[in-house]
Amino acid sequence: METVLKAIADWIKGILTAGIMSNLSGLFDDVNTQVGNIAQQVGTKPSSFEPRVFAMIEALSRNVVLPIAGVILTFIACHELIQMITEHNNLVQFEPALILKWIFKTAISVWMISNTFDIIMAVFDITQKVVSDSSGIIAGNTRVNDIGLSMLQSSLMQMDVGSLFGLFLQSFFIGITMRILSIVIFVIVYGRMIEIYCMVSLAPIPMATFGTHEQSHMGQNYLKCLFALGFQGFLILICVAIYAVLIQSVAISGDAINSIWSIVGYTVLLCFSLFKTSSVTKSVLGAH
């Protein structure tokens, strides 16, 4: 009878051990892929990230948004002219230099909305130069190795059924968590670029407000937000560099499960840090 029970216990151990190893094998592949691609993705210009999408955004901005910006600019220019005339007693005390100032401001505003995309790309050229230069300095291996898992299987068979069942539940939860974290990293990196495309599509409207002091805060805040999105890539690289240092300090050895939980914790910390990069850059640049 004891032999039968031992055989059943060994059979259950074999099933649980196989399940644990199945859950843990390739555990870090998705996260390694996403983290490894971060530097390449954040270092790509909006025009190069997805050229077809960028061409569509540019066409929409020029054909749909730009005419609206022209109407806004016309209203602002007329309002500025009327205000200038009324402030100087209906031209009785009017100085010719003021009309030249108005013409100059209006011409600059027209030039800005006509060359909106060149200005926007110049902003991202500056920020991407910072990102590309920093990527050469910030270097680190972000890949998590699971070589220690091969030593884990032999030690699992020495454990009792209850402990193995607990480890099986942990490994199942860890597997789901790591896949969710890889999706979160993907969403953060690609969501930033989609946010950039959305900001760029409406660029002519805030650019049209630079012609008046009362409304120019809209355009100024817009440029701050653009710089914040650009420099967010720099902070993302810093987060990845810190993650690379932390992750290499973890060795999957005898106590593999605890080591894996440490890696999960560092990956959660990475995701949280990536989420915070947007608010940090906006706070530093005073954008809202």
Question: Which residues are covered by each model-predicted region?
Answer:
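Membrane-embedded alpha-helices of multi-pass transport/permease systems
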Residues: 75, 120-127, 184-187, 191, ...
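Hydrophobic alpha-helical transmembrane segments
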Residues: 66-79, 196
